[in-house]
Every structure is written in C-alpha cells, then in structure tokens.
Amino acid sequence: MAALTVIGTSRHNPQALFPTGSCRHILSTTRGGGEPVAAEATSWQKEQVSRAYVHALSTQGGYTLCDWNVDKDGVDVTLRSGPWMVDIQLKCTQSPRIVRGGFSFDLDVETYDKLRNPDRSAPGHLALLIVPPDIGQWVTHQSESIILACHGYWASLHGLGGASGSVTTAIHLPEHQQLTVKAMGTMFDAARRMTNPAGRGVN
C-alpha cells in the first residue's frame, strides 16, 4: 500500500529537489516526442492541491474538516475539534514573494476584513501554500509512497487593524509559522481563548 509523504520546497529556491531512479511523476506535461516540459498550474489546480495538503494534516491531527462550496465569508475550509472551530482562507502560489523573515501575500481587502472581524465565531487565518514552479513535480509516485511537494505558512488575522490598501493589503507570513499539525493545535488554542477569555471550562 502506498503511503502519502508531504515534503517541502526550499524557501530560497521554490524548485523542489525530488527523488530520482524509480520515482515516476504522476502529473506531467510532455512535448510531441515525450520530453517533459514545465507546466503552469491553473487556479483550480492550485486550490485543489491546497485542500489536499490541509486534508492530510487535519486527518493526522484528528480534526474534522469542512469544505465550503462558496467562500463568501472569506473561508475555504473550517477545522473542528470538539466545540472549537478554526476558519482558514487558502492561497497557493508557484512563485512566492520572499521578504525578511518570511513571505508576503497581497490579500483582497474584502476577504481581509471578513477574516479579521473580532465578532467571528471562529478565528480567521490565511494559509499560503507553496508548490514547485513545474506542476509535473507536484506529485511523485514510488513503490512505497506518494510524495506531495507542497509546504505552507499561516498567519492569524483575527482582530487585526484596518487594511493598508484600498484593494489589497500585504499579509506577512512568518517563516517560523509553517502550516503543520502542531500549528493547527496552536490555532485551536487561540480559538479556546477567544471563546473562553476567562478560561472558563478549558482544561
């Protein structure tokens, strides 16, 4: 049975280094003679690989995950652990903008205002998933594993101030805030504090 392995790309070089030998790329684009060429991903492909990444992490962490058909509230997925929930807006890029201490992403102001709203029932977060420039290197298949070349970073937007721009606002995603199972636990800790500010009923 094949196992799923999630690996990351280098922060300074988004082009991932992949296993060689018997490894076979599942997703690939070829010229007429069969020679592989780099392929730019469409928006729906980026969206789906982002969801796959979060699904894998939430499953390992034992969290329930809900996909929303429409993100009119600025939310793509909601995680749940018992009575607590975490809302996440997912973004994916093949060419991340690197800044000091992490990454920067221009989020539309409408979504930003929804996620930062202090009256939300669940804290809002932005997650930025980074994939290799060549879609043919996103997924590779070995005899014992399927490797997903994707890694992510996150930022909590709950309760932040007004946007710096009128159309988009730059969101800083710290390098140390990688999107992992442990990070999801941190998000739920914040959700508990938000719903129980005095610590009532929290173990």
PLM features: what roles do these ranges have?
Residues 1-73, 78-203:
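Mixed-charge (Asp/Glu-Lys/Arg
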